[in-house]
Amino acid sequence: MAAPVTKKPILLEFEKPLVELEERITQIRTLAADNQVDVSGQIQQLEARAIQLRREIFSNLSPAQRIQVARHPRRPSTLDYIQAISDEWIELHGDRNGSDDLALVGGVGALDGQPVVFLGHQKGRDTKDNVLRNFGMASPGGYRKALRLMEHADRFGMPILTFIDTPGAYAGVSAEELGQGEAIAVNLREMFRFSVPILCTVIGEGGSGGALGIGVGDRLLMFEHSVYTVASPEACASILWRDAGKAAQAAEALKITARDLKQLGILDEIITEPLGGAHSAPLETAQSLRQVLLRHLKDLQALSPAQLREQRYQKFRQLGVFLESSD
């Protein structure tokens, strides 16, 4: 049997001090083994320092750095989470109008024995796969496929679980010709009408209308290092300052992090990620997600269909409310 292939880690810029420390630990171990010297005490101190440094780095990430984590090539995807948390699931294809968009996937499954419908944006793992899935940017056919599956869920009384991970809806000429804006708008309208619980989770990046197309729900959840924004920081910087190089400044101003959105009352719960991000321990992350989804589903299933629709409507009506000073 062939030995398992170990993937080379993909490092982010701000992780370099940590990597240098870990490489130093490895070098000391190697030298100690070659020379039969006991340096266990020194290694123990360095390992403790590495853990502390990792904790310091990931607890003080800037919005721009969180975007890097949200876009990490090995961050768990929609299909990763569905396969990890579901008892079983069957992917369903097509919008029944000649399209099957691979950038938006969905199907029927079971979560803790309960039938549900899963939906989500799907990015690729490498360049070839990303081209196939259009980098997670869904077309009108993708949103119409999502609507078909959500209508199926509503008809048979199955909760809807959506996973958001897209830089935005596909903005090509072909998408506009096929009615991208209309497809997203119809989804927004219909999601307010459904009588089943809807849980929306931002698992990576939630970009603009592309995220909203499957983002109207009774609860909005976000992973700790995910982002949710009206426009990418690069696009925002290009529009406001005519300089994409100011993306970090735009990321700060846009209030895109889970912490920011929780303070603004947009987000219902932040799902904690393992130290180092979701990609560092995907199975642990998936189990955390599963527990949170089950808890919220239990709360929502205690409500009548009319209560669900009314609370969902009021949740979105209250977004953007602010008070002006009388001074």
Swiss-Prot record:
InterPro entries assigned to the protein according to its UniProt record, in alphabetical order: Acetyl_CoA_COase_a_su, ClpP/crotonase-like_dom_sf, COA_CT_C
Top-rank lineage group of the source organism: Bacteria
GO cellular component annotations of the record: acetyl-CoA carboxylase complex
Keyword vocabulary terms for this entry: ATP-binding, Cytoplasm, Fatty acid biosynthesis, Fatty acid metabolism, Lipid biosynthesis, Lipid metabolism, Nucleotide-binding, Transferase
GO process terms (BP): fatty acid biosynthetic process; malonyl-CoA biosynthetic process
One GO MF term: ATP binding
Enzyme category, top tier: transferase
Presence of the UniProt keyword Transferase in the record: yes
Location(s), subcellular: Cytoplasm
Signal sequence segment: none
Residue ranges of every copy of the CoA carboxyltransferase C-terminal domain listed in the record: 46-299
Catalytic activity: N(6)-carboxybiotinyl-L-lysyl-[protein] + acetyl-CoA = N(6)-biotinyl-L-lysyl-[protein] + malonyl-CoA
EC number: 2.1.3.15
Pathway it works in: Lipid metabolism; malonyl-CoA biosynthesis; malonyl-CoA from acetyl-CoA: step 1/1
Role of this protein: Component of the acetyl coenzyme A carboxylase (ACC) complex. First, biotin carboxylase catalyzes the carboxylation of biotin on its carrier protein (BCCP) and then the CO(2) group is transferred by the carboxyltransferase to acetyl-CoA to form malonyl-CoA.
PANTHER family: ACETYL-COENZYME A CARBOXYLASE CARBOXYL TRANSFERASE SUBUNIT ALPHA, ACETYL-COENZYME A CARBOXYLASE CARBOXYL TRANSFERASE SUBUNIT ALPHA, CHLOROPLASTIC
Protein family membership: Belongs to the AccA family.
Subunit structure of this chain's protein: Acetyl-CoA carboxylase is a heterohexamer composed of biotin carboxyl carrier protein (AccB), biotin carboxylase (AccC) and two subunits each of ACCase subunit alpha (AccA) and ACCase subunit beta (AccD).
Protein name: Acetyl-coenzyme A carboxylase carboxyl transferase subunit alpha
Organism, scientific name: Synechococcus elongatus (strain ATCC 33912 / PCC 7942 / FACHB-805) (Anacystis nidulans R2)
